[in-house]
Amino acid sequence: MSRLGIMVLTLLLLVFIVTSHQDAGEKQATHRGAINFRWRRSLIRRTATEECEEYCEDEEKTCCGLEDGEPVCATTCLG
């Protein structure tokens, strides 16, 4: 094989290695972003639940969740 052929094959191999390495980095970043989003969402939900419980506790009722961002209080929660 000529030197030119060896150089072309080496270049193709390098391009393949670099692109596969970049794809792996993007997948890892996407996965990390998904984990951060899940954690953030659970933190927001927990805070909203605590606020709902405090709000309903003042009315001596049970917090049944949030509806349109407003706490829903009742003596007995259905469903």
Swiss-Prot record:
Primary localization class, coarse: secreted
Modified residues (Leucine amide): 78
Signal peptide region: 1-20
Pfam families from the UniProt entry: Conotoxin
Keyword Signal: yes
Localization terms from the record: Secreted
Domain of life of the native organism: Eukaryota
Protein name: Conotoxin ArMSGL-021
Expression (tissue specificity): Expressed by the venom duct.
One Gene Ontology molecular-function label: toxin activity
GO cellular component, as recorded: extracellular region
Keywords, sorted A to Z: Amidation, Cleavage on pair of basic residues, Disulfide bond, Knottin, Neurotoxin, Secreted, Signal, Toxin
Taxonomic lineage: Eukaryota, Metazoa, Spiralia, Lophotrochozoa, Mollusca
Pro-sequence residue ranges: 21-44
UniProt comment concerning the protein's domains: The presence of a 'disulfide through disulfide knot' structurally defines this protein as a knottin.
Disulfide bridge positions per record: 52-64, 56-73, 63-77
Assigned protein family: Belongs to the conotoxin O3 superfamily.
Organism: Conus arenatus (Sand-dusted cone)
InterPro entries: Conotoxin
